[in-house]
Swiss-Prot record:
Keywords on record: Isomerase
Xref: InterPro entries: Tauto_MSAD (IPR037479), Tautomerase/MIF_sf (IPR014347)
Protein name: Probable tautomerase YusQ
Disulfide bond entries: none
Chain's gene name: yusQ
GO MF terms, alphabetically ordered: isomerase activity
Entry superkingdom: Bacteria
Similarity field: Belongs to the 4-oxalocrotonate tautomerase family.
SUPFAM superfamilies assigned to the protein according to its UniProt record, in alphabetical order: Tautomerase/MIF
Length: 127
C-alpha cells in the first residue's frame, strides 16, 4: 500500500497532473506489483519562493521542472524492484509528459504493516 506525495512548481493543468499521477501509478503496478485499485496520491504545487533544490547535486543537472516523488510504502520490495521502479517512472514521465529524466527525483520511505490505518481508526493490515 504505497502512499505517494508529488511536489512540483505550480502552473500545470489538471489534465497534465492527472496524467502524471496515472503515469506514476502504472509504473508501480508493473514494477512493484501494486494492485490497480491501491491508488492513493496527493499532488502539491508550489510557487518559486517555496520550492528549493540544488541544481547540480551529485552531478545531476536539475531545472525548475523538477518533480519530487515521495513514496511511503511497506518494506517489502527488493533493491532491484526499487531500481526498476526509479527507471520506469523517470522514463515514463519523460516519454509521456516531456519532463527530463534528470528532473525526476524519487524518495522511498519504508514502514511496517502496523504503520497504516485505512479508516475507522483500525490497523486493517494487522487485524
Amino acid at each position: 500500500m504505497p502512499f505517494v506525495q508529488i511536489h512540483l512548481r505550480s502552473g500545470r493543468s489538471e489534465v497534465w497532473l492527472q496524467k502524471l499521477s496515472r503515469t506514476i501509478h502504472q509504473s508501480m503496478i508493473e514494477e512493484i506489483n501494486v494492485p490497480e485499485d491501491d491508488y492513493f496520491q496527493v499532488i502539491r504545487q508550489y510557487e518559486k519562493s517555496e520550492f528549493f533544490y540544488d541544481p547540480f547535486y551529485l552531478q545531476v543537472e536539475r531545472t525548475d521542472e523538477l518533480i519530487y516523488i515521495h513514496f511511503t510504502l511497506k518494506q517489502s520490495r527488493t533493491t532491484e524492484q526499487k531500481k526498476a521502479l526509479y527507471r520506469s517512472i523517470a522514463s515514463r514521465i519523460h516519454s509521456e509528459l516531456g519532463v527530463r529524466k534528470e528532473d525526476v527525483f524519487i524518495m522511498l520511505a519504508g514502514n511496517q504493516d502496523e504503520d497504516w490505518s485505512f479508516g475507522n481508526g483500525r490497523a486493517q493490515m494487522i487485524e
